[in-house]
Structures are given as C-alpha cells and as structure tokens.
From Swiss-Prot:
<comment type="function">
    <text>Catalyzes the formation of the alpha-1,6-glucosidic linkages in glycogen by scission of a 1,4-alpha-linked oligosaccharide from growing alpha-1,4-glucan chains and the subsequent attachment of the oligosaccharide to the alpha-1,6 position.</text>
</comment>
<dbReference type="InterPro" id="IPR013780">
    <property type="entry name" value="Glyco_hydro_b"/>
</dbReference>
<keyword id="KW-0119">Carbohydrate metabolism</keyword>
<dbReference type="Pfam" id="PF00128">
    <property type="entry name" value="Alpha-amylase"/>
</dbReference>
<dbReference type="InterPro" id="IPR017853">
    <property type="entry name" value="Glycoside_hydrolase_SF"/>
</dbReference>
<keyword id="KW-0808">Transferase</keyword>
<dbReference type="GO" id="GO:0004553">
    <property type="term" value="F:hydrolase activity, hydrolyzing O-glycosyl compounds"/>
</dbReference>
<dbReference type="GO" id="GO:0005829">
    <property type="term" value="C:cytosol"/>
</dbReference>
<feature type="active site" description="Nucleophile">
    <location>
        <position position="419"/>
    </location>
</feature>
<dbReference type="InterPro" id="IPR006047">
    <property type="entry name" value="Glyco_hydro_13_cat_dom"/>
</dbReference>
<dbReference type="GO" id="GO:0005978">
    <property type="term" value="P:glycogen biosynthetic process"/>
</dbReference>
<comment type="subunit">
    <text>Monomer.</text>
</comment>
<feature type="active site" description="Proton donor">
    <location>
        <position position="472"/>
    </location>
</feature>
<dbReference type="Pfam" id="PF02922">
    <property type="entry name" value="CBM_48"/>
</dbReference>
<keyword id="KW-0320">Glycogen biosynthesis</keyword>
<dbReference type="Pfam" id="PF02806">
    <property type="entry name" value="Alpha-amylase_C"/>
</dbReference>
<dbReference type="InterPro" id="IPR006407">
    <property type="entry name" value="GlgB"/>
</dbReference>
Amino acid sequence: MRKPRVTAATSGPDGLAPASDVAAIVAGTHGDPFAVLGVHEVGKGLFARCFVPHAETVTAYTLTGIEAGALSRRDDAGFFEGKLSIKKRQPLRYHAHNAGGDWWLTDPYSFGPVLGPMDDYYIAEGSHLRLFDKLGAHVIEHEGATGVHFAVWAPNAKRVSVVGDFNDWDGRRHTMRDRRDTGIWEVFIPDIGAGRPYKYEIIGPDGVRLPLKADPFAFKSELRPATASVVAVPPAHDWGDEAHRNYWRNADPRREAVSIYEVHAGSWQLHDDGTFLSWDELADRLIPYVVETGFTHIEFMPISEHPYDPSWGYQTTGLYAPSARFGDPDGFARFVDGAHRAGVGVILDWVPAHFPVDAHGLAHFDGTALYEHADPRKGFHPDWNTAIYNFGRREVVSFLVNNALFWAEKYHVDGLRVDAVASMLYLDYSRKAGEWIPNEKGGRENLEAVSFLQKMNKEVYGHHPGVMTIAEESTSWPKVSAPVHEGGLGFGFKWNMGFMHDTLEYFSKEPIFRKHHHNDLTFGLTYAFSENFVLPLSHDEVVHGKGTLLSKMAGDDWQKFATLRAYYGFMWGYPGKKLLFMGQEFAQRREWSEARALDWNLLDFRPHRGVWQTVRDLNYLYRSRPALHGRDCEPEGFSWLIVDDSQNSVFAWVRNAPGGSPVAVISNFTPVPRDNYRVPLPKAGKWREIINTDASEYGGSGMGNGGMVEARAEGKNISATMLLPPLSTIMLELVAD
C-alpha cells in the first residue's frame, strides 16, 4: 500500500494559501491541488480558491446561481481566493472577467471524489472486473452537475492532469486527485461532454514532464496521425441479436460448424479514392457477401486503435477503442448487430502479448516501466521492437482481462483470437542464451503469462457463455484448449499451425514428387484430436513475399486452380474448424497488401469464380452435414479408408457424427484420373456424390461418377469402384435406405 503523500498546510491563520502552494499551483507542479483549490473550511467560515489564467476578476456562485463572494487575485497568473458568504460546503461556479470579455466555469476542485472505497479495494486487489466502467472518461452527473469523470492509473507520477481543447491543453488547469492507495488519479470536470479530445499530462517521479499520454481506457481515439483520446459514451445501440446470442450460449462450439472468414477491415474493399469504408458501409457489403459465401464467422484482424497502418493493427495503442479509421464506435456495434441478425458471428483478433513504444502510448506511462517489465530481457520484444506486458503485475493483468470482458459485453463479440500466444508462454522466445531470465523454478516457461491466460479464459467463459477464445500458438505446449481445472490454458480452440505448414509444403511439390511426401498429409492425424483445432489459412501465408495460396500450388495455371480447389475440399473434409483469409476464396493472384483493396474484378473470370463457388459449396456442405462438423474435435468422428497409397497420392477417410449420414472424403493429388479405383467404405449401399472439385461448373474437367457410386460387400469387406478425377477431392454421402 502506498504511503500518503505529505502536503503543505492548506491555509494560514488568515485563510490564505501558503505562498509555496500558490507558486506550485501556478507552476503546475503541485501534486495535491485538492488540498489547496476548491472550497475549504477556515475557522468557522468557508474559503474558495481557484486558478483561472487570464482572468482579472472572479466571482463565486452556487450551482443554483446565488452569489457567494468575490475572490481576490493572489497571483497575476490567475490564482484567486476569498471568503464565501455561503454556510454549507458545495460545488461552485465562477464568473471570470478580463478586458476581452467574461466567461463562466464550474470549479472541478469543489466536487468530491467519484470513486469509492470498494473501488479502491477491488482495484488494489486486482479483482475489479468492471474497470471499464470506472477508469477512462465517463460522462456522468455528479453532485448536481453534468460533466466527465476521468480516472487513470499512474502510481509513480508526481502529478497527473487532464488536458484538452477545453483548457487550452494547459496541464495546470485540471490536475487530478491522487487516490494514493491504488495509484489511481481522478477528477470530475463539469461542463464538458462527449466528443472532446483529451490526453494526460504526467510528471514522472524524477520531476520530468512526459510526452502527453493517450488514455489506456479510451473508448474512442482521433484518426491517425492525431493521437488524442476522445470522450465517448458507451454504444447506445438498440441490440436485436438475442436469438443469435442465445443460440451460441446453449451450443457447444466444438460440435458446431465454425467456418471463419478472416478480414482486414481496412483493405477488404475501399472507396474509389482509396479511403476506408465505414462500419455501416462494411455492413452493407461484407455481411451479405459472407452470408452468400457460407461462412459462419467473420474474424477481423485487430480493429483496436493503432497508429501505424502497416502493423495491420497488431501494434495497438488503444485496446478499448475501435479504430477511428472506420467511423464512430457505435458503427462497430451496428456492424456486429447486423452480422448477428444475419446469423454471422464476429471474432476479434486480440493482442495482449505486446504493445508499441510510441511516445503517446503505454510505454513508461508514468515515467517508470509500468505496463511493461523494466528489464528488457523480459520487457522488450526483439522481433517486433515492442514492449511486453508485465503479466506478474496484478493491475496489468486486470487491465487486459477487463479488455477481453469489455469487447464481449459492450460490443457483443462472439470470440477473441489471441495473437502470439507462443511469445507469451516462453521466456526465451526468439532470444539467445543470456538474453532471457529463467522463471523461479529455473525453467523457460513464463509462469506469469500462463496464469494470466488462465485467468482471462476463466473470466471470459464464466461471464460470457457463448463467447469462444482461440489461441494462435505455434508450439507443442500441452493442453492449450483444455479447461483450467484440468491444468490447461483454458482456450476454446487452438490454431493448427502444423496442418497449415505441412499441407502447404505438400501442395508446393510437383505431383510426380508428392509420393515421396505422403507423410506430410497423414502425420497431422496423429495429433489432430490432441487439441480443439482450427485449421488456419491465414494472412500470415500471403504476405512478406510468400505470394498467395494460388501461387503456392505447383504446376501450370490449370493445375494451380485444380490443386487449390482440391486442397480446399481436403481441408473442409478434414477434422477441425476452418479459417480462410480474404481474397483466397477466389484465388487472389497478387500478394495481399494493407494499402490496397482485393482484386474483386477476378470474380469475372471463370477460374477464379470457380474457386469461389467451390468454397461457397464447401461451406454449405460443412454446415448442413453433421458428419463434417459434429465431431471435428473427437477421434470417433474420423476413420481412415486409404492412408498408404503414396504411389498414387490418394487419400480417403470417412467422417461421421450423430444426426447425419457418414461422408467419405477422397482426394487424388495427381493430374492422372484414376479409373476403376477401389475405395473401402463403411457401409454397403448407394453413396451420393455431394461435391466434386473437378466439376465443370468450378472450372474443372468435369470427370466424375454420374453423381452416385454403389458400395458392395465382398465377404467381410465393403468397397466401391469409382473414377477419381485429376487433382480433385470428392465427397460421398451414404444414401439413407
């Protein structure tokens, strides 16, 4: 607990403030202005003191308009004080005058605190789960006045002020009250409201005035390159998504169809002049497109405020503020509601691993390493030149956990995909020997980060049933998606990076060589059910010179398109939830750049249109067939039919789940049609072809089996003879008797 700061006496025998206090107020260095300014008892009377730069005269009034006394100018810089005629301590308004005119202002120092002892208790304990209702800027009514309550955590600061256009960005005007025990500073500023830009002016423990800081809890920010926070009220949206939310509250997402369309909101589409679409414009275009294409969820790359476009949002300076690039925060609420009404979920890419060191951000926030570790071996990320959150500090953990809860509560998001989890879990991540500090047990595991992730997941799942968390975790850390009470991290799902790597490596090989790499596609099934997996073909695979998914496929142009369609068929038939980055659903040719829109004109060309139709039909099949999604995370839902035909590069398995017919998935990854190919099947009878990625309507050769094959029993074996089209995946569904 912090010791109370010793302050000078508030007045002498005559009621006047000590000269040292006056000088400190005028200089803007006083750490406890509430001990000097405002209304104070002196003897049996009341005195008022205020600092009003540029005023020549000041008269005090009650909020009801009763004159309370003229104040004397103690210092030409604008310090006034005087005895009041009122008998009861209360908030005051001042009428100020100079040669240029007169104006009114309400005294922020005549109001009592807004936060209470219970807030102090839970904040100090790190257990406050509604910090976003207490910290930041909130428009409220307080002691008879309307204004904005500001609160910020800066425990090592000597002085913190709110600055904005309402006080000419003068840090002497609205210095905050230090609550001491918690390190929270607060002030209620009357007569201002939503829409006002502001920052915090902080004097660090060494007495140095820091660069102006944005509010860590700001709900809105200025459009870059401006960096101020903006006073904003919570979304005032009339939500109509109860049916959607009720469905997912009562669902087990592991047994639901989850097909995710990963989107960068700033480049999916743009205006003709290259400017961003607003949230409302995105809602009008993106939501119908996602519905038509059959995806169940949109996953946005980070939309929290960030200063640098090429960071794609992964270097955020405003975790609580939807980026101003796309309009007001209410617009994002309308987008989510519109998506929900259309049956589409919204997942946010969330970045609690690190933050940029921009001067207006969290780095050295109060003049010390506050949100980050002081030791760069734990507090600085060498790959990204960013600061790493101090997960061992309860206030930092509380800041991050509250942010996860904030998006679920205020914006109704359906999930959080947590970025760079591996970098959080390992103290030696991307570090050489001597560049990292072992944990208390001598190991490389970041036990503090583990504890944070477990707490975050427990709170999200505990407070918001129906919201899922997804880990981007690229190592073999065990039990990422196991419950915390079983020793897991508590995520709902984990990205299957091995699937992505192995399959892309396989399909980059010329078909004649694939027989030597057969294990690339079979190995994944040895661990496919060790976690609840999402199969990601994400933005990471189409940037930094990696090309596009189409360009990664081996062969000439026809083979590339055929292989990509077959790959998608393979993936949609493979156990695990699906994720596809925007543009890859129609085989974008150019590598993705955040600076330009997708090449939508490609949909006018048949090969590209065919890939889009393939993805659309796969999505509808995946959603409508329980066998393809009901046991995505359970080994009982998968059985190999053909695992060892490396010579022909053929793979086959069957998917099944309660409530639906079994579906066989058969892939031929050579350009050679395999006629009279015998495939074992689990049941005799007719099997209907429900998709063939080589179909002519997709741009394929049109080879197939006339829509049906028949499996016959020969002794104990059941099989069907069929044609396997070149570079194709087909799915067969057992026809009910």
